[in-house]
């Protein structure tokens, strides 16, 4: 497909550019989350990521064009050396776990340690509990995730479902707002969380028991 120089220039015109890495154990649904964010499409069967996959999408945040580079990393041990090299230039990290598999939640401290060891200082970290559509198979309480996030000083916890389009957009909008706020801290001195509607009106799961799916720390 051919793009004119003017089309390329328009695509390259942005106010902010942020690099975000998506990490976590294998088969927690990281690729499904990224694909849904990119195209709004959910694919039931996804092959495991080999090394690192790269996706770009621009968001309009309060009249500013924010280009989000999302790096979907493989969770398998044999790819760790490759994926660790991508930590260094990341502005933010999203750690994903599968709320139907307790072991993926228990791995979160390991992933936080990886970020602290290989990432830059002051990387913004968010936690997402994926597959919240499978609430009847839940093995991780939302309250446990909030407690862990508070312990490690993470930005927020959201429960997501790529299959049912729950909180996928909100994850990246919240992250973009926080990164903009931190980038402009010397001007505004406030966190993006101060003005986010989700804080005062938590998202509720439509199917199954009524539960909060978003908390900020």
Curated annotation (Swiss-Prot):
<feature type="binding site">
    <location>
        <position position="131"/>
    </location>
    <ligand>
        <name>GTP</name>
    </ligand>
</feature>
<feature type="binding site">
    <location>
        <position position="133"/>
    </location>
    <ligand>
        <name>GTP</name>
    </ligand>
</feature>
<dbReference type="GO" id="GO:0003924">
    <property type="term" value="F:GTPase activity"/>
</dbReference>
<feature type="short sequence motif" description="Switch 2">
    <location>
        <begin position="74"/>
        <end position="89"/>
    </location>
</feature>
<feature type="modified residue" description="Cysteine methyl ester">
    <location>
        <position position="217"/>
    </location>
</feature>
<feature type="binding site">
    <location>
        <position position="163"/>
    </location>
    <ligand>
        <name>GTP</name>
    </ligand>
</feature>
<feature type="binding site">
    <location>
        <position position="75"/>
    </location>
    <ligand>
        <name>GTP</name>
    </ligand>
</feature>
<feature type="binding site">
    <location>
        <position position="42"/>
    </location>
    <ligand>
        <name>GTP</name>
    </ligand>
</feature>
<dbReference type="GO" id="GO:0070062">
    <property type="term" value="C:extracellular exosome"/>
</dbReference>
<feature type="binding site">
    <location>
        <position position="130"/>
    </location>
    <ligand>
        <name>GTP</name>
    </ligand>
</feature>
<feature type="binding site">
    <location>
        <position position="49"/>
    </location>
    <ligand>
        <name>Mg(2+)</name>
    </ligand>
</feature>
<dbReference type="GO" id="GO:0005525">
    <property type="term" value="F:GTP binding"/>
</dbReference>
<feature type="lipid moiety-binding region" description="S-geranylgeranyl cysteine">
    <location>
        <position position="215"/>
    </location>
</feature>
<dbReference type="InterPro" id="IPR048040">
    <property type="entry name" value="Rab19/43"/>
</dbReference>
<feature type="binding site">
    <location>
        <position position="26"/>
    </location>
    <ligand>
        <name>GTP</name>
    </ligand>
</feature>
<keyword id="KW-0378">Hydrolase</keyword>
<dbReference type="Pfam" id="PF00071">
    <property type="entry name" value="Ras"/>
</dbReference>
<keyword id="KW-0472">Membrane</keyword>
<feature type="binding site">
    <location>
        <position position="32"/>
    </location>
    <ligand>
        <name>GTP</name>
    </ligand>
</feature>
<feature type="binding site">
    <location>
        <position position="28"/>
    </location>
    <ligand>
        <name>GTP</name>
    </ligand>
</feature>
<feature type="binding site">
    <location>
        <position position="43"/>
    </location>
    <ligand>
        <name>GTP</name>
    </ligand>
</feature>
<feature type="binding site">
    <location>
        <position position="31"/>
    </location>
    <ligand>
        <name>Mg(2+)</name>
    </ligand>
</feature>
<protein>
    <recommendedName>
        <fullName>Ras-related protein Rab-19</fullName>
        <ecNumber>3.6.5.2</ecNumber>
    </recommendedName>
</protein>
<feature type="binding site">
    <location>
        <position position="31"/>
    </location>
    <ligand>
        <name>GTP</name>
    </ligand>
</feature>
<keyword id="KW-0488">Methylation</keyword>
<keyword id="KW-0547">Nucleotide-binding</keyword>
<comment type="similarity">
    <text>Belongs to the small GTPase superfamily. Rab family.</text>
</comment>
<feature type="lipid moiety-binding region" description="S-geranylgeranyl cysteine">
    <location>
        <position position="217"/>
    </location>
</feature>
<dbReference type="GO" id="GO:0000045">
    <property type="term" value="P:autophagosome assembly"/>
</dbReference>
<keyword id="KW-0342">GTP-binding</keyword>
<feature type="binding site">
    <location>
        <position position="30"/>
    </location>
    <ligand>
        <name>GTP</name>
    </ligand>
</feature>
<dbReference type="InterPro" id="IPR005225">
    <property type="entry name" value="Small_GTP-bd"/>
</dbReference>
<dbReference type="InterPro" id="IPR027417">
    <property type="entry name" value="P-loop_NTPase"/>
</dbReference>
<dbReference type="GO" id="GO:0006886">
    <property type="term" value="P:intracellular protein transport"/>
</dbReference>
<keyword id="KW-0449">Lipoprotein</keyword>
<feature type="binding site">
    <location>
        <position position="72"/>
    </location>
    <ligand>
        <name>Mg(2+)</name>
    </ligand>
</feature>
<keyword id="KW-0479">Metal-binding</keyword>
<keyword id="KW-1003">Cell membrane</keyword>
<feature type="binding site">
    <location>
        <position position="29"/>
    </location>
    <ligand>
        <name>GTP</name>
    </ligand>
</feature>
<feature type="binding site">
    <location>
        <position position="49"/>
    </location>
    <ligand>
        <name>GTP</name>
    </ligand>
</feature>
<comment type="function">
    <text>The small GTPases Rab are key regulators of intracellular membrane trafficking, from the formation of transport vesicles to their fusion with membranes. Rabs cycle between an inactive GDP-bound form and an active GTP-bound form that is able to recruit to membranes different set of downstream effectors directly responsible for vesicle formation, movement, tethering and fusion.</text>
</comment>
<feature type="binding site">
    <location>
        <position position="45"/>
    </location>
    <ligand>
        <name>GTP</name>
    </ligand>
</feature>
């Amino acid at each position: 497909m051919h793009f004119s120089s003017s089309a390329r220039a328009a695509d390259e015109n942005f106010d902010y550019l942020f690099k975000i890495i998506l990490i976590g154990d294998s088969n927690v649904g990281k690729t499904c989350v990224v694909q849904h964010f990119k195209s709004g499409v959910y694919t039931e069967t996804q092959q495991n990521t080999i090394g690192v996959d790269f996706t770009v999408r621009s968001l309009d945040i309060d009249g500013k064009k924010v280009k989000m580079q999302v790096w979907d990393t493989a969770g398998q041990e044999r790819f760790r050396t490759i994926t660790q090299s991508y930590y260094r230039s990341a502005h933010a990290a999203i750690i994903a776990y599968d709320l139907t598999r307790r072991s993926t939640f228990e791995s979160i401290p390991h992933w936080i340690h990886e970020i602290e060891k290989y990432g830059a200082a002051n990387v913004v970290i968010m936690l997402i509990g994926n597959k919240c559509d499978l609430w009847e198979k839940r093995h991780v309480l939302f309250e446990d995730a909030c407690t862990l996030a508070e312990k490690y000083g993470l930005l927020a916890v959201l429960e997501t479902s790529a299959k049912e389009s729950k909180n996928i957009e909100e994850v990246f909008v919240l992250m973009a707002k926080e990164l903009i706020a931190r980038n402009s801290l010397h001007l505004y001195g406030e966190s993006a969380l101060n003005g986010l509607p989700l804080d005062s009106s938590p998202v509720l799961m439509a199917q199954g028991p009524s539960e909060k799916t978003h908390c900020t720390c």
